[in-house]
Amino acid sequence: MTARTMDAGTGDVTLFHTSQLDKLINMARENSLWYLLFGLACCGIELMQFGGPRADVMRFGAIPRASPRQADFMIVAGTLTYKMAERAKLLYDQMPEPKYVISMGSCSNCGGLFQLGYSVCKGVDKVIPVDVYVPGCPPRPEALTEGLIRLQELIRSEPWATKRRPAKGSAA
């Protein structure tokens, strides 16, 4: 993207290449992602493996945070009930912009095995916008790492100055 300005006095034209600035800022953003864990069921066990030395997500710049006010994205893993949906929405609202969500596992994506239960939300995307879906029951840490890479690609491709758009949802 190029912006053009013209000096009224001399008539000189100055070109600014803002795409290079976008690339630089997005490179910094994509390689320093801090995440908030919202593990609800079986997928919470795989989240422990995701943060362990074998998966080594810190090489991608992903660091767990205890507070939503410090997190760039949230990983929702497991069966989301209507009662917990209020808490998930509250945590999402407390995160600073730009914020992203990874839905991990069949239960988070669509309700999974428990989708016919009266208290089960039929997917996290009914409550908060989801950017990346990671399928599986439960998904392996490698699948979640692939989801993290997809999130980095999403961040790399969007202009940094835009406001948050509704999530499109990409499958990992």
Curated annotation (Swiss-Prot):
It is found in: Cell inner membrane. Its main location: membrane. It is a peripheral membrane protein. Transmembrane segments: none annotated. Its cofactor is [4Fe-4S] cluster. [4Fe-4S] cluster binds at C42, C43, C107, C137. It catalyses: a quinone + NADH + 5 H(+)(in) = a quinol + NAD(+) + 4 H(+)(out). The keyword DNA damage does not apply. HAMAP family: NDH1_NuoB. NDH-1 is composed of 14 different subunits. Subunits NuoB, C, D, E, F, and G constitute the peripheral sector of the complex. This is NADH-quinone oxidoreductase subunit B 1. It comes from Anaeromyxobacter sp. (strain Fw109-5).
